Every structure is written in structure tokens, then in C-alpha cells.
From Swiss-Prot:
GO terms for molecular function: GTP binding; ribosome binding. PANTHER family: GTPASE DER. Keywords: GTP-binding, Nucleotide-binding, Repeat, Ribosome biogenesis. This is GTPase Der. Residues 355-439 form the KH-like domain. SUPFAM superfamilies: P-loop containing nucleoside triphosphate hydrolases. HAMAP family: GTPase_Der. GTPase that plays an essential role in the late steps of ribosome biogenesis.
Amino acid sequence: MNPVITIVGRSNVGKSTLFNRLTRSRDALVADFSGLTRDRHYGKCRIGERAFICVDTGGFEPVAKTGIVAEMAKQTKQVVAESDIVIFLVDGRLGMAPQDRVIADFLRKTGRPVILAVNKTEGMQASVVTADFHELGLGEPFPISSAHGDGVRGLIDDALDSLGVAEPDEDELVNDPNRPMKIAVVGRPNVGKSTLINKLIGEERVIAFDMPGTTRDAIEVPFERNGKPYILVDTAGLRRRGKVFEAIEKFSVVKTLQAIADCNVVILMLDAQQDISEQDAHIAGFIVEAGRALVVAVNKWDGIDTYVKERARLEIAQKLRFLDFANVHPISAKKGTGLKDLFKDVDAAYAAAMAKLPAPRLTRILQEAIEHQQPKRVGMGRPKLRYAHQGGMNPPIVVIHGTSLSGVTDSYKRYLEGRFKDVFKLRGTPLRIQMNTAKNPYVDADKGKKGKKR
């Protein structure tokens, strides 16, 4: 699973600036998805080929007893407990503050790995600006500048190295179709996730509770269906202590995001009896950003009348319109209605996500799309899209080569995406398009000639 790195520190030390720098690719990735709601506190990041989940937290006061500050501290303590490593950010310009010592004391007691990062050190001598922070007893302080990016790559590399997160091998970068498909069942508390898993596997392997938010730990349940192996990942069930299952009081966003990042297909469960919430949209947004194949299950459909059903359909279409690539299934997890069609779509979505797209056919589709509608002119010229090939699976990635491709608009990319998906019948999976502008050998040659002395 993707490791979780949490950024903590007192207010105004630059936590959000660091978070935004680490997740910049995430913002760019989803900018053209109309209506997509993003959770500002959680982001999927990548350094080279190493992926991780980053968590931003509010100003941390671990000893606060009441009010909103205490509630923020409670949330931060929970996410620290679920993290693989913590980056403790302090302000190098203002120097040591009493609150820094309080936070350091708390972090030592948690037993979580901690890297002390001294922010806002641009233009300052590292040995001087970090000197005071040695007394916190959290190892060698790491000087960085979140605003300028100085030292950030080294900081994250050190964090991932300390966790033993290596660059994935060639085989790990390619999805193995011989491995069991891994399905993550996700959704906000009490929508019936564990009930669905119980019904799919036909036994009480995961005990369902009728109380919102029951586990921090994703439980993997291997099973077979029609002779085919699967693994179901439940992020809603319970934690096991020996032979006893114990309900946990709080829904875990971190475990949900890890399960999404680690699976092949996501079943997003919604409650037909409740409005689409901001939390529903946040989870849906992360699924899109992770590029996962998706099927939407609207649970408790049997318990509502025709008017409420129509309203639910309309609300999903409006509030989750960025999920238009996925099929929506009304189900009853308790009674088992609608599950046969749901699982057919799970298989179909996985097949679409793993589809092989031959380069000659991709190029032909590209050329036909251009003949039907050319990209808009940029200045005096027009982007030239010459050929395409597949660049990855799960999700499918189409790499387009040509010249002046920086001028291709987001709307034209969506147009091309639709053409590729229609021809290959890719339903249930996002499709990514990458533009690769070719170098002009004549321009490069001219530059070389100008540099020569006669």
C-alpha cells in the first residue's frame, strides 16, 4: 500500500505550502474535470516512481482541552497514529517556539517515525538556522523552503528511504492480469459496505455493525466467483483483537485512500436515503485522481419511493457529474438485489482498465478525430498531432506525439478522450491523455551552427 506521510506543526509554519507543492500534479490532473470537489487535506503524490499519500493538518496544539483547537488536535492525533511517518515542520525564520517543544514531546510519545524539517530557510545558512532545533531531540533538522522548493525532494526521498520504499521494479509497474483483481469497497460511514461484502462472498467473514464508522484497518477478503479469484478490500468493517471483532468509533479517511490507491476497481457506495455529501464527493474525487476503474452502487434502494429515487438519480448526475465514465447501480446489499449486474460491471470496468490499445489503431482514431474537428489555432499556428500509442494501463494512458502540443486545450483533450473511449468501448475507467512534443531537429541544428566559430 502507498505509505502515508503526515505534515504537522503549529500554525503558520508553511504546512499547506509544503502540501500544495507536493500535490501540484494532483491539482493539474483534475483541473479539467467539471464539478470535481477536492479534499484539501489529503493528496496522492509521486516522487519519481514512488507514490505516497500526503496529509495536511491544522495548527497543532496537542494539550488543548476545549473548542475548535481541541477538535483539530484530536483529528491530528488520529491521523498521526495512522501515518507511516510524520514530517514535523518548524519555522526557521522565527526560531524555536514553546509550542514546538510541546509538539515534539507528543510526537516522541507516539512512537511514529519523525523527520524534523526547518522551513523558510531560503537565503540563510543552514547550520545557523537549524542550530536551535537540535534540542528537540528528533534527530538532525532538515532545512527546506516550501515556497521555493529548496530541499523538498531530498526531504521526501529521506522519508521514503527510511520506510524502505524502493523504486518499483519493471514488473511492478505493469499490472499483472494473472493476479487476483483487487476491489476496494469505499464510501462514507454506514452506507452498507460490510453488508455488501458479506453478501458477495456469501459468509460472515466481515461482521457488519449498524453504527457509523467501524474500523481503521482495511480488511482484505479473498474469495472466488465463478471460478475466478478476487480480493475484496473493506475499509468500513472492524478491527480484530485475537478472535474478537471490535467496533471502532471513527471512519478512517487514510485507510480509504490507501485502499483506493492499492486496488484495481473501486465500488463507491452511496446511501439512497441520504443526500450526496461533501465527504461522498471527496472520496469520489480521490478515485478519479487515482485513475481507478469505478462502479457506483446506490444502496438501500428498496427502502425509498419513486419520488426519492428520481431525486437521487438527479442528485448523482449533478453533484457527481465528473463520474460520468462509471455505471450507477441501484442495489440492496441486505437483500442482495442488483448485485449480479453490479459484479458484471466490476469485471467489465477491470477489463476496460487493462485493455491493450494497438498503436496503429490509436493513430487512425486520432487522425479521424482531427479530420472531424481540428484543434484551435494558437497564435499563427495550429498544434500538429501526428501519432499515438499506449503509455500505460489501469488507467489506460494514450500518449500523443506532435508539435506545438502545449496549445492543445483541455476541451480538445476531452474530445479526444471521448473518441478513444467510444471506439474501444472503454466503460467504467478513466482514460488519461499525455502530450509529447517532438523536438525540431532543424531548430536544434541551427542552434548548433550559430554556436560554431568560423
